[in-house]
Swiss-Prot record:
GO terms for molecular function: dihydrolipoyl dehydrogenase (NADH) activity; flavin adenine dinucleotide binding. The pyruvate dehydrogenase complex catalyzes the overall conversion of pyruvate to acetyl-CoA and CO(2). It contains multiple copies of three enzymatic components: pyruvate dehydrogenase (E1), dihydrolipoamide acetyltransferase (E2) and lipoamide dehydrogenase (E3). GO terms for biological process: 2-oxoglutarate metabolic process. Homodimer. Transmembrane segments: none annotated. Its main location: cytoplasm. The lineage of its organism: Bacteria, Pseudomonadati, Pseudomonadota, Gammaproteobacteria, Pseudomonadales. This is Dihydrolipoyl dehydrogenase. It catalyses: N(6)-[(R)-dihydrolipoyl]-L-lysyl-[protein] + NAD(+) = N(6)-[(R)-lipoyl]-L-lysyl-[protein] + NADH + H(+). It comes from Azotobacter vinelandii.
Length: 477
């Protein structure tokens, strides 16, 4: 006789494990299925984010930036360190320990909340039955009233650059280099490519980023993207736009990349090549042919505004559905679905999902960009405040970038907040909170901000919307 649950979640990433915990907290008998094995060969919860994505990449970004500071900035503070060297294996080991700590923490939370964990591959069958196949090939079928599909995504592979996880690697392989490559190529100038390129550039690699599109960071506010390209180029990233990779050849532990740009066919040799051209949903072998769940032509699961699929009682969240592939988006969808299964009226505001690129300076935004609003014909007022005018940023020797606030010209309601600069990820969240409550730029300008603080840049940008910034000359409105 099969086990019966109220909710079964397939996939223990940021969407799945959060959905499982929330379901259990709401009194639902919950099971969670995960097949991923970590480096030690044991089941590791947390999905791509905790294991080979958000967290390990941030660990390497922080380590590499500390090296950069010691090498370039300490002397400005009167600190003498002698010769600064990087021990890459130690840096990688630190990253791995952080991953173990966090995935172990998730496992403890799953247990503490009474969620039943099944280790193996989960597959949705007809009639909301779920088959779990263990690593040894044994299987069992579980019964449930509700299923949450949260199987995540994986890196996109391209024929011109087949990944071997040695010379040509994907985002996972790029987290485990044991030495700094002399010349590093990156295909894709998106979030992953820029972050990983930054890690190894700071440590001394000569980095070239090949981007097929003619525009840099097209989804980011244009003013921010332009500033980002200028700063990252100055940091040593050679960014080639309109460069379409046509082939690769690996020989003697080097790879020659062939590409075409506006000038014609070209080639360049690298010690390592990172393929970072996006991610695709993991839906292969997730659904039985008679499960009733519908996929689109790209393999995403069709869902409504509340993440419900075409089958009553079956939901899908995170990277397997429409929208941005972001861990925090997946987590919130998991909470909303659990709440709705429990009979509560929950919904998610997809218009206010912050997005961050963890380069240095960080790049972050929430709400609409200036170019999007102009394309919609919305009349706007814009306020910008540079970190070069921030006392706190000066004290930290971290003055690149600015905060930008966009408000409706008629109502003054804040429609977008965009930041490039120190702690942009934290500052943009203040904008998200304000926008969630329908705040006007004037409201933000009337609030008291601590001094000295980086957040004062948000305050001043809000004041600048109406031409009343205090610590920078105002543009005539």
């Amino acid at each position: 006789m099969s086990q019966k649950f109220d909710v079964i979640v397939i996939g223990a990433g940021p969407g799945g494990y959060v959905a499982a915990i929330k379901s259990a907290q709401l009194g639902l008998k919950t099971a969670l299925i995960e097949k991923y094995k970590g480096k030690e060969g044991k089941t590791a919860l947390g999905g791509t984010c905790l294991n080979v994505g958000c967290i390990p990449s941030k660990a390497l970004l922080d380590s590499s930036y500390k090296f950069h500071e010691a090498h370039e900035s300490f002397k400005l503070h009167g600190i003498s360190t002698g010769e600064v060297a990087i021990d890459v294996p130690t840096m990688i080991a630190r990253k791995d320990q952080i991953v173990r700590n966090l995935t172990g923490g998730v496992a403890s939370l799953i247990k503490a909340n009474g969620v039943t964990l099944f280790e193996g591959h989960g597959k949705l069958l007809a009639g909301k039955k779920v088959e779990v196949t263990a690593a040894d090939g044994s299987s069992q079928v579980l019964d449930t009233e509700n299923v949450i599909l949260a199987s995540g995504s994986k890196p996109v592979e391209i024929p011109p650059a087949p990944v071997d996880q040695d010379v040509i690697v994907d985002s996972t392989g790029a987290l485990d280099f044991q030495n700094v490559p002399g010349k590093l190529g990156v295909i894709g100038a998106g979030v992953i490519g820029l972050e990983l390129g930054s890690v190894w550039a700071r440590l001394g690699a000569e980095v070239t980023v090949l981007e097929a599109m003619d525009k840099f960071l097209p989804a980011v506010d244009e003013q921010v993207a332009k500033e980002a390209q200028k700063i990252l180029t100055k940091q040593g990233l050679k960014i080639l736009l309109g460069a379409r990779v046509t082939g690769t050849e690996v020989k003697n532990k080097q790879v020659t990349v062939k590409f075409v740009d506006a000038e014609g066919e070209k080639s360049q040799a690298f010690d390592k090549l990172i393929v970072a051209v996006g991610r695709r949903p993991v839906t292969t072998d997730l659904l039985a042919a008679d499960s009733g769940v519908t996929l689109d032509e790209r393999g995403f699961i069709y869902v409504d505004d509340y993440c419900a699929t075409s089958v009553p009682g079956v939901y899908a969240i995170g990277d397997v559905v429409r929208g941005a592939m972001l861990a925090h988006k997946a987590s919130e969808e998991g909470v909303v679905v659990a709440e709705r299964i429990a009979g509560h009226k929950a919904q998610m505001n997809y218009d206010l999902i912050p997005a961050v690129i963890y380069t240095h300076p960080e790049i972050a935004g929430v709400g609409k960009t200036e170019q999007a609003l102009k394309a919609e014909g919305v009349a706007i007022n814009v306020g910008v405040f540079p970190f070069a005018a921030s006392g706190r940023a000066m004290a930290a020797n971290d003055t690149a970038g600015f905060v930008k606030v966009i408000a409706d010209a008629k109502t003054d309601r804040v429609l977008g907040v965009h930041v490039i600069g120190p702690s942009a990820a934290e500052l943009v969240q203040q904008g998200a909170i304000a926008m969630e409550f329908g705040t006007s730029a004037e409201d933000l300008g009337m609030m008291v901000f601590a001094h000295p603080a980086l957040s004062e840049a948000l305050h001043e940008a809000a004041l600048a919307v109406s031409g009343h910034a205090i610590h920078v000359a105002n543009r005539k409105k």
